[in-house]
Structure formats: C-alpha cells, structure tokens
Design a protein with these regions (language model features):
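Outer-membrane beta-barrel porins/channels
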Residues: 2-183
Length: 183
C-alpha cells in the first residue's frame, strides 16, 4: 500500500555502561571501589523512497535518551589496619537526551543474472545530547554481611554554581560510503 515509500521505527540500545572494579594498595588492602551502570538508548523513525528502479533515498530521526551512574568509594583504615567505621562515597549521575538524524542513498544495478553491483552513502550531521548532571557525596557504613552501602550523611554538590548542572555531549558528523558485488 505504500508503493515506492517505506517506513520503519524501533528502539535499540546505543551504548552500555556496566563495570565493577576494585583497587588495592601494595599490602593488598582494599582502597577504592568503582561501579558504573546505565547507557544510552535510541528510539527512531525512518522513511525511504524509491526514486527510480535502481536508486533509493532515506532519512531517519532518532531521540537518544538514558542515564549513566558512576559510583566511587574510598576506604579508610586505622593505624592497626582495621577498616574505619565510615567510608566516603561519590555518586555522579547524568540524565541524557537529544535528537540526531541520518540521510542515505543506495544504488543497485543487476550486471548479470547472478551479479549485482550496490553502492551506498550515508551522512549524519553533528548533533548534541544534553546531559543533566548530579553529584552526591556521602559518609557511608558498609554492612559487612551484605556489602550494602548505608548512607549516614549526604550532601549534593551545587553543580549549577559551577556551570556543570547541564552540559552538552557532541556527536560528530559522520559520512560513510560503501560498495559491493554480490549474487
């Protein structure tokens, strides 16, 4: 029913963050614990049109969204090597969102009954993704049985005063070309 038009939509993961690292000193005593989670997803809507028998063009628009949370814990010890009651934790959270676009063209021609030539090009203009940022510092107790972090005292850093509450991530423009021969 669409004739020479085509359309598509979808939701796909774009990036993913997931790590848990620990750092020890020369005596193999835990000093730092690092954790990251989250990622960027994209929901997209695309459309294409067949200009001629061998030539098609298309465009898609994407909304990129998600969040990334990075947590760092610094462990303190007394002179006898015992872990202090309170540890320091920093949590950085970035909530992300922004639009991006792609345009493309594809040409194909049947050279022989079992040989087709295909060439394509795409262009993605530069785009910006807004990041709304938060930073929190806490004194925490870590339950030795469950490893659960229990905040005792927390403070949110005023990133607005530093001009960092909202920042921009820049996606560079991208041009790609390709061609191939196949059956």
């Amino acid at each position: 029913p669409l004739g020479k038009f085509g359309a598509g939509f979808g939701l796909i993961p774009y990036t993913s963050v997931g790590y848990k690292l620990q750092s020890f000193n020369s005596d193999q005593i835990l000093q730092y614990r690092y954790r990251g989670e989250g990622g960027l997803n994209k929901v997209f809507l695309g459309a294409g049109y067949q200009l001629s028998k061998n030539l098609r063009v298309g465009v898609d628009a994407s909304y990129n969204f998600g969040n990334i949370i990075n947590t760092n814990i610094a462990f303190g010890y007394n002179e006898q090597g015992g872990r202090l009651q309170y540890q320091s934790r920093e949590i950085n959270r970035s909530d992300l969102g922004g639009l991006s676009y792609n345009i493309g063209v594809i040409y194909n021609k049947l050279l022989k009954p079992n040989l087709e030539f295909t060439a394509s090009a795409t262009y993605s203009p530069a785009a910006e993704i807004k990041s709304k940022n938060e930073r929190n510092f806490s004194a925490i107790i870590i339950d030795l049985n469950t490893d659960k972090e229990i905040p005792v005292n927390s403070i949110d850093l005023d990133l607005n005063a530093m001009g960092l509450s909202t920042t921009d991530l820049k996606l560079p423009s991208k041009t790609s070309f390709g061609f191939g021969f196949g059956a």
